[in-house]
Amino acid sequence: MAVKMRLKRMGAKKAPFYRVVVADSRSPRDGRFVEEIGYYNPITEPSTIKLDEEKVQKWIKNGAQPTDTVKKLIEKAGISVK
């Protein structure tokens, strides 16, 4: 099973916020996921990023590939990926 860390879109029309989830790469964007590891709200000023550092480290260690957007969010949140 190819596992990715990616964004799941939530919220209302024109007012999105995103949950950062670990999901099978074959699942739809807003479909089934394995675990929720945080959220991202681009609407607030400044935008809100909250990630569970332990879960991020665990999933990267177990081989989950973060998408490009999630990589940027991890860097912005100040989490060092070993």
UniProtKB/Swiss-Prot annotation:
Presence of keyword Zinc: no
SUPFAM superfamilies, A to Z: Ribosomal protein S16 (SSF54565)
GO molecular function: structural constituent of ribosome
Keywords, alphabetical: Ribonucleoprotein, Ribosomal protein
Pfam families: Ribosomal_S16
GO biological process, one term: translation
Domain of life: Bacteria
InterPro entries (UniProt xref): Ribosomal_bS16 (IPR000307), Ribosomal_bS16_CS (IPR020592), Ribosomal_bS16_dom_sf (IPR023803)
Gene Ontology cellular component list: cytoplasm; small ribosomal subunit
Family to which the UniProt record says this protein belongs: Belongs to the bacterial ribosomal protein bS16 family.
Protein name (record): Small ribosomal subunit protein bS16
Organism of this sequence: Clostridium botulinum (strain ATCC 19397 / Type A)
